[in-house]
Amino acid sequence: MDVHLRLAERRDAEAIRSIYNPEVVESTVTFDLVPRTIEDQVAWLDDHSGGHPAIVATDGADDVVGFGSLSPYRPRAAYSTTVEDSVYVHRDARGAGVGAALLGELVRLGTAHGFHSAIARIVGNHEASIALHSGCGFSTIGTEREIGRKFGRWLDVVLMQRML
């Protein structure tokens, strides 16, 4: 697949939502329990600008096939040099290098914006995301046991980090 990356724009809100919402209602890769409305998605995009960008991956037809973002790791000031990444790939585009392209660009953007480290918080059974992050230079630094509950199951979160 021919993958192109660019900063996300408001016009991408529906495409991003169409990738994200199935994960909300059908999987544990996000701990959100309620699908996003278009207004929620536009607000999310508005919050991801400057040093905490959202990006999209498009195919040759300029259709959005994945998205990623950098978010503040925690609100307290001493955490301001650390970001948390998120990467989502459309189910039909998985295995085509979209996730690696998105994560590589997020690492590049985080470095360019002067952040010191990036954190990934990955549900414990999401082996593809753990492998993706490992392949992009992230190391496992711990596991938070049973900190989320979805679909009647307790969920662990694997913490991974990369120094930028």
Regions found by a protein language model. Name each.
Residues 4-16:
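A short beta-loop-alpha structural element at the N-terminal edge
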Residues 18-35:
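Helix-loop element at the rim of GNAT/NAT acetyltransferase active sites that forms part
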Residues 20, 62, 133, 138, ...:
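Conserved active-site tyrosine of GNAT-family acetyltransferases
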Residues 52, 155-159:
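Short hydrophobic/aromatic beta-strand or adjacent loop that forms the aromatic wall/cage
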Residues 69-72, 77, 119-122, 134, ...:
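Conserved catalytic-core motifs of GNAT/GCN5-like acyltransferases
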Residues 95-110, 127, 131-135:
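Conserved acetyl-CoA-binding loop-helix of GNAT-fold acetyltransferases
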Residues 110-122:
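Conserved GNAT acetyl-CoA-binding A-motif
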